[in-house]
A protein has these predicted regions:
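N-terminal beta1-alpha1 ligand-phosphate binding loop
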Residues: 2-28
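Cofactor-binding loop segments of dinucleotide-utilizing enzymes, especially the Rossmann-like FAD-
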Residues: 9-10, 37, 115-117
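Residues at the starts of beta-strands that form the adenosine-phosphate
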Residues: 3, 31, 109
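Conserved small/polar residues in nucleotide/adenosyl-binding loops
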Residues: 164-171
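Mobile beta-alpha loop/short-helix "lid" or hinge segments that flank ligand
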Residues: 35-43, 133-151
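Helix-loop-strand module that forms the ligand-binding subsite of alpha/beta enzymes
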Residues: 54-134
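Active-site-adjacent alpha-helix of alpha/beta-hydrolase-fold enzymes
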Residues: 22-25, 130-137
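N-terminal beta-loop-helix "entrance" segment that forms/cooperates
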Residues: 38-54
Length: 171
């Protein structure tokens, strides 16, 4: 089975959703490692700050964890119709690592999920565009939940199965 990295862009309901999905993924034989982007607390990315910061504390550790994942599941709330700032900022810093900004992302299988106050469709669309642009293979089915709509167990189970199917086609 796959080594999965669950990336959380919030500590609240999205972290709880990630734990719920983890239980299903582990029951299917996958291993799961969690990354909380808030724990890294990277400064806001700017070109000037990048030049002034030859070594960004924590970035190597984050790259190492993300590299271990054969696939990622990104959980993020919707902020003003798009991704939360911590996700955009982290991606900005990650894309500046090394000579090839897509190296970490290229051909990486990515699933998307959200627990949002609204519908969550906008953050899913924004993440789908961003991760696709970076070279990821984004799974078509997404997990959208909110206070009135609990996580769909069929979707929770279908997404880890998608990882398995995609890996089977790689060999």
């Amino acid at each position: 089975m796959a080594n999965l990295v669950f990336i959380c862009a919030s500590e609240g309901n999205n972290a709880l959703l990630a734990r719920e999905v983890e239980a299903h993924a582990v029951a299917m034989g996958h291993s799961v490692e969690h990354v909380s982007l808030n724990e890294y607390d990277f400064p806001i990315y700017t070109v000037a700050r990048e030049k002034a910061t030859p070594v960004l504390e924590g970035i190597d550790r984050l790259v190492e964890v993300l590299d271990r994942g054969e696939a990622w599941f990104v959980f993020a709330p919707e902020y003003n119709g798009t991704c939360p700032p911590v996700l955009n900022n982290t991606i900005a810093w990650l894309s500046r690592e090394g000579d090839d900004f897509r190296r970490l992302f290229r051909d990486r299988v990515v699933a998307l999920g959200t627990h949002s106050g609204g519908g969550g469709n906008h953050v899913i669309m924004a993440m789908r565009m961003q991760f696709s642009f970076l070279g990821c293979v984004v799974i078509g089915r997404s997990l959208l939940t909110n206070k009135k709509k609990p996580a769909n167990p069929d979707t929770i189970n279908a997404i880890p199965v998608s990882y398995t199917h995609l890996r089977a086609h790689e060999t």
